[in-house]
């Protein structure tokens, strides 16, 4: 039997609607928001005090359940200019307190509305401090968001039988190249899209770079045809060892152009040069 982290209800407190069950048998009760459906993902945590919009729209969190350690989420809403991708692919979100009445002159939607729009489940009212310590001490594991009345044995069976997805880069990478240009540019850069965040492109533009974004499986010949001054390998989800096209591309680019990697891109460069990557 797993341990149950079920807060003592206050007088007139509405009944819990959802719960999460970890692969280790621990369960935590709370209230659902966003999409009203069951979901199983890998659980991770993020310690940022602000930036939940950038986190939920970061392709690096594809099919992951993100625990937000900062206790108040949703209070400044969602602004159209702050997304890191057009279509968020985060698996879900777990928060301590959710605020559905944002105060921010820039906001256009609430976090709940965006989660509903993109069919992303979330839960609030959870003891995220305890949950984060479990992840820190035991490592990432699978988790389910399910109804509060789902039997523990049933939820555990679903979690333990579920196989986590692979090859997520092909899912989030662009299917055809696109460009982001600036006037009086200084450099031409090719960005290999493994799940690129818009802010990487914005920052490259800011320092005078025209950016051509290409799919992760682009060939050396296709990239060299743009006559770039350098190549950027983006962030992305999943295991970098699965992204063999980019690893091979780095080996072919070696000595030809400057190469810069961010997050997964950095790991892909390391793998191409013979290093090993290990899941933390």
List PLM regions with ranges.
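RNA-binding accessory domains that recognize and position tRNA/RNA substrates
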Residues: 11-188, 192-226, 240
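Cysteine-nucleophile active-site neighborhood
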Residues: 229-280
């Amino acid at each position: 039997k797993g341990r149950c982290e079920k807060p003592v209800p206050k007088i007139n407190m509405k009944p819990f609607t959802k719960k999460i069950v970890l692969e280790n048998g621990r369960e935590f009760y709370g209230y659902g928001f966003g999409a009203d459906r069951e979901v199983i993902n890998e659980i991770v945590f993020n310690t940022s005090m602000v930036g939940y919009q950038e986190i939920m729209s970061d392709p690096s969190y594809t099919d992951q359940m993100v625990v937000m350690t900062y206790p108040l989420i949703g209070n400044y809403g969602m602004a159209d200019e702050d997304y890191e991708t057009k279509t968020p692919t985060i698996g879900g979100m777990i928060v301590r307190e959710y605020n559905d009445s944002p105060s921010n002159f820039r906001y256009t939607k609430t976090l709940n509305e965006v989660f509903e729009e993109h069919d992303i489940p979330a839960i609030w009212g959870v003891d995220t401090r305890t949950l984060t310590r479990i992840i820190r001490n035991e490592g990432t594991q699978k988790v389910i968001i399910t109804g509060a009345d789902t039997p523990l044995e049933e939820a555990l069976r679903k979690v333990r039988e579920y196989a986590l997805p692979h090859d997520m880069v092909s899912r989030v990478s662009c299917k055809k190249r696109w460009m982001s240009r600036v006037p009086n540019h200084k450099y031409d850069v090719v960005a290999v899209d493994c799940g690129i965040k818009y802010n990487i492109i914005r920052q490259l533009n800011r320092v005078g770079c025209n950016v051509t974004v290409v799919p992760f499986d682009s060939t050396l010949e296709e990239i060299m045809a743009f006559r770039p001054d350098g190549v950027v390998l983006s962030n992305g989800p999943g295991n970098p060892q699965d992204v063999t096209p980019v690893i091979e591309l780095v080996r072919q680019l070696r000595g030809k152009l400057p190469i810069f990697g961010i997050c997964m891109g950095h790991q892909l460069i390391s793998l191409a040069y013979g290093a090993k990557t290990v899941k933390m």
